[in-house]
Amino acid sequence: MKALHFGAGNIGRGFIGKLLADAGIELTFADVNQTVLDALNARHSYQVHVVGENEQVDTVSGVNAVSSIGDEVVDLIAEVDLVTTAVGPVVLERIAPAIAKGLAKRKAQGSERPLNIIACENMVRGTTQLKGHVFNALAEEDKAWVEAHIGFVDSAVDRIVPPSASATHDPLEVTVETFSEWIVDKTQFKGALPTIPGMELTDNLMAFVERKLFTLNTGHAITAYLGKLAGHQTIRDAILDEKIRAVVQGAMEESGAVLIKRYAFDPQKHAAYIQKILGRFENPYLKDDVERVGRQPLRKLSAGDRLIKPLLGTLEYGLPHRNLVKGIAAAMHFRSEDDPQAQELAALIADKGPQAALAQISGLDAASDVVAEAVNDYNAEK
């Protein structure tokens, strides 16, 4: 089996690429970073530091790399069995034209072999969004063939992969936590279902997507935003602050009440899942910076993302949301010189005031009680 993975960054190498290579799949990375491409093609291997209760170093071998712009990547799409991505939500649109060209070439070659494409991004139904971008780039006469032969498979991914603080300055070395979860929608595959250790198949993906979004992502973001406000450097420092921990755990319990109502999750199992995630935030081996985790606050405050979506669930079911609102107020305070979205957020609040700004970003009604509550919390932190 052959696979092409877009994105040779830390998540690509440390998570999805590692699982594919470990499964004995012939793997090629596609990226724009020439330093990483050259290193991969010189060595065809790299090291992954897996940190947690037991620290180990795994070697991933037998990998190749190509530029994600150019003919080579198009040729590969025409011949592989699986395409995966870990490029970040905003980059999906940029790689879509190359995928469209590769699919058109595949059709022109008369290939009948199914190909499945899985976007492994920190977003809801990322592959469905990628499919939209690909179809925008396809010629009209190719669309029916692609619909029949190409599976666009949505997934939920979960593994904390902080930027590597490699002492060796090796561009390929990566550190990951022990925990990992890759859940894919088995109803969307074309052809036989693959057997890849570490890939879990489900016919109820949205339950897992929202479980991860409402727990890991919600908790991670609120830890970062409250941590930044309190002057903490890392997620671990922040979650060990009892005041912050109480709000974060409270927010995850509030979002969890939505999940229990919506998907009939077992309350005790979900409480254990929350505790496991709090333990992951405490991992002393992960030097995860609050500024990195908090970046792109406009996206994280949008209606379908980790802060507002669980809040909307609490409003839908008439459930408490006090801690979620505190997290939203903290997100509105996020400032970073290195993040254009943080600067845009600050400018929007300065221009329109917190009430109108939050309503515009989140889609919440500016006159609603919940926006008033968030604005009160925001002003209390000034």
UniProtKB/Swiss-Prot annotation:
PROSITE patterns for the chain: MANNITOL_DHGENASE
UniProt entry keywords in alphabetical sequence: NAD, Oxidoreductase
Reactions the enzyme catalyzes: D-mannitol 1-phosphate + NAD(+) = beta-D-fructose 6-phosphate + NADH + H(+)
GO biological process, one term: mannitol catabolic process
Residues that coordinate or bind NAD(+): 3-14
Molecular-function GO term, any one: mannitol-1-phosphate 5-dehydrogenase activity
InterPro entries: 6-PGluconate_DH-like_C_sf (IPR008927), 6PGD_dom2 (IPR013328), Mannitol_1_phos_5_DH (IPR023028), Mannitol_DH (IPR000669), Mannitol_DH_C (IPR013118), Mannitol_DH_CS (IPR023027), Mannitol_DH_N (IPR013131), NAD(P)-bd_dom_sf (IPR036291)
Pfam families: Mannitol_dh, Mannitol_dh_C
Top-level lineage group: Bacteria
Gene Ontology cellular component annotations, sorted alphabetically: cytosol
Enzyme Commission numbers on file: 1.1.1.17
Homology family: Belongs to the mannitol dehydrogenase family.
Listed name of the protein: Mannitol-1-phosphate 5-dehydrogenase
Annotated gene: mtlD
